[in-house]
UniProtKB/Swiss-Prot annotation:
Function of the protein: Negative regulator of class I heat shock genes (grpE-dnaK-dnaJ and groELS operons). Prevents heat-shock induction of these operons.
Keyword Transcription: yes
Protein name as catalogued: Heat-inducible transcription repressor HrcA
Similarity comment: family membership: Belongs to the HrcA family.
Gene expressing this chain: hrcA
InterPro entries for the chain: GAF-like_dom_sf, HrcA, HrcA_C, WH-like_DNA-bd_sf, WH_DNA-bd_sf, WHTH_transcript_rep_HrcA_IDD
Amino acid sequence: MASATEKRRYEVLRAIVADYIESQEPVGSKALLERHKLNVSSATIRNDMSVLESDGYIVQEHASSGRVPTEKGYRLFVDSIHDIKPLSLAERRAILGFLEGGVDLEDVLRRSVQLLSQLTHQAAVVQLPTLKTARVKHCEVVSLSPVRLLLVLITDTGRVDQRNVELDEPLEADQVTVLKDLLNGALAEKTLTDASEALQELSRNAPSDIRSTMEKCSGVLVATLVEQPSDRLILAGASNLTRLTRETAASVPMVLEALEEQVVMLKLLSNVTDLDHVTVHIGEENEDLQLRSASVVTTGYGSAGNTLGGLGVVGPTYMDYPGTISKVSAVARYVGRVLAGE
């Protein structure tokens, strides 16, 4: 159990972090006494700040300035957050109403990051559900010409993928119908990974008049949708990163590059598996070099207990952690409600 002195020093640190998040200006002992009810003398505050600095939680950037939190200080602050202030009823209604206006899954997710970027004043990202975990709802086969087909794959997550298939020989309308029925019989309710074997068997056993066409269609589906599923991100609010303080502005190009390349964020969001937990990576805790001057707050979204993907925000290390955690969690929860039709 922490001693009274340790508890007081944490309160001093909490006050420094809160003030710095609000002002982005170094915090001095005089300002702490004026702004916070710490109920101790200025000498005690200065001594506590000295100990916190020695322990690596705060740093004095210039001899005549106050202190600013270090990443270690932010980490202790975040780890000590137990009670997240809930959003107001008006905020919750506004979030749900905005998300319910989405016409499909991708539109709902696009709205979710627009909302998150506005609520947090950070860059917001969401990962579209990967085809690895999606189940096939329907496969539409459209004849574009006698020797060209369009395959439209629709999953239970609402994702739609389209692929063109060039044929070696013309296909009649009734053959297109047979092809569609066979594909749906093999794919319906299966994950695309599980469907790979079924597609290969389907090619071997298809009627002779459409066997070569079935082989081509199955090959396209297996090669592009099973073996190489395309993960995608939706990004909103990147311009928020350009409004940082002078001290952090130099790192903006690297962070923007990480967001634009998508690979870094896809890797991070792909590791999100928990619908009920918000993860915070601060500065050097981020594996990728491009994000080591930023903080990333992520959680999972989904429905019926299944995680479909990750969403979150990217911002400076001096972000409003309690508010950001609350808003990321709330938006993810309401995305799940909309997807579940609640």
